[in-house]
Amino acid sequence: KRRHKKAATLADLIAVVCHNRAVKSLHVPASFPIGLAMQLHERGLALVPQPEPFAQKRLTKTKSESNEIARVQAINDKAMEAAYQLLRESDIHHKDQTLFVGSQPLTAELVRQTIDLVLLKENCLGLNTIVACGPKSADPHERGSGTLYAGQPIIVDIFPSCRQSGFFADMTRTFCKGKAPDRLRRLYDVVAKGHAIGLKAVRAGVS
């Protein structure tokens, strides 16, 4: 639009596209933003909310799709193994419990770099991989940064996508170098019990 006129909004763009195609109603997810819904309604479009999942075809996977997901997850396994080996081979500086690799402190950035290299060699991208230590590990989706320490939880969460197929994998593991504190051991036991309960409930057709 010209500078003296109001800039086009997302609702304007959607309305124009629908008008050009003689579309008068749209099926939208039940969680569709109410503000945008009202704007589209004002522009003459009827919205029909649909139950989740919105894309029903995503409920099932073909054999080839399942195989591709398994392949990407196998690559993810390799990346997690590389992170594990780096932590395993690190040394503990007993004065302050800092982890070292050679003469350098082991950092979240170095672990993430190691993970990324494995993924890139397999044509996968690991965006926003999490390597979070200590208090940072308690903040969901905190990427983590800086030096890693012994005796503290180290969360590693890798969720790469294949650059060719677009399929994702996801894996999270909690590591602790050296002796784990009792509080962390108790937390592990609780999570392990919950995990076992979840596995027993998993079967085809369960919502």
Spell out what each predicted region is:
Residues 1-207:
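Active-site neighborhoods and metal-handling regions in enzymes and metal-associated proteins
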